[in-house]
Amino acid sequence: MDKANPTVSVIVPNYNYARYLEARLQSILNQSFQDFELILLDDASTDNSAEVLDKYRNDFHVSHIVVNEKNTGSPFRQWMKGILLAKGEWVWIAEADDLCEPDFLETCVKQVNQYSNVAVCMVASRFIDEDGDMLQGHADYWASKKPNVSACFFPGKAYAAHNMYWNNCIINASGVLFRRSYAVKLYDSVFLNMRYSGDWVFWFQMLLQGNMVEVYRELNYFRQHTSKVSVEGINSGKRIKEDIDTYVLMENTFPDIGIYKRRLAHGQLYRKIKKVKNVEKQAELSQYLYEKLGGKASDLRLFHINKYLRWVCPWIITLKRDRLKK
């Protein structure tokens, strides 16, 4: 490996995951593809994470260990800190609590070199619990009907307008290899000021710059925790607000998105709002949705009606029908 010009920069952003760090770092260091630098970031953990990271200070792959004195409160600011430190053509944000197969990097690097102007390469993932045991179900939208090919290439802007519009189908950064030169351009993007939906915005903006490759092999293991930040975000309404802001960005980017498709998406947002337990918070979010996107209760009714219309109208748009797939 040329430490000055590695092919891949592996960024491990950590906060209070000392108990998972050694297994995670070994899963990276044991990769069959070894042309990478390792950037270790800690966001002022209160456990012994800094001590664990320090054990790897003299490892040949480790180029940076940065321990914050004060917590940033933003995983996405840590992402960008690592991206700006990175020297590789490609970046892998290997979340500190996840795991991977030994040929994750080898497979992804092969795929991104096979196609033109790739911005993002995503593998299939499985869920694991806090103890590392496999959970039921799959993490990927294609799991119920796997393609009969090993990988597929998609034009980035089309993927953003169809697949990423409905929801963030790239659910875990640990399962992605992406182009650093495109990510650096997002150094002042709005995703940095988000707490919950920043990854959705990041992947969307990456795909506006280059193309997408989906790899249909389970090479990533996405750890699920009993207490999740996303649940807190939904109950407080903050995540839903960020989702609404994300739709504003996407609809401004693609002004030709049809009204029916928009209304279905707004109906999805309204359904999330109805699940918020606090009635006053529901009213606040409904007003925010209306002000930002013109979304209203009738969009939710259309969303439910659409579920029945899809059976008698095979041409009608639905989330699954609108997605690009092979």
Residue ranges with predicted function:
Residues 1, 252, 269-326:
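Membrane-interface aromatic/basic loop that binds lipid-linked glycans or pyrophosphate carriers
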Residues 142-239, 243:
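Conserved nucleotide-sugar donor-binding catalytic segment
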Residues 91:
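Short aromatic/hydrophobic "clamp" motif used to bind/position activated sugar donors
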Residues 103-143:
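Conserved donor NDP-sugar-binding/catalytic core segment of glycosyltransferases
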Residues 27, 42-51, 70-72, 95:
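A conserved acidic beta->alpha catalytic loop
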Residues 68-86, 99, 107:
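Glycine-rich, basic loop-to-helix element that forms the pyrophosphate-binding segment
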Residues 5-8, 29-40, 48, 60-64:
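Short loop->beta transition adjacent to catalytic acidic/histidine clusters or analogous donor-positioning motifs
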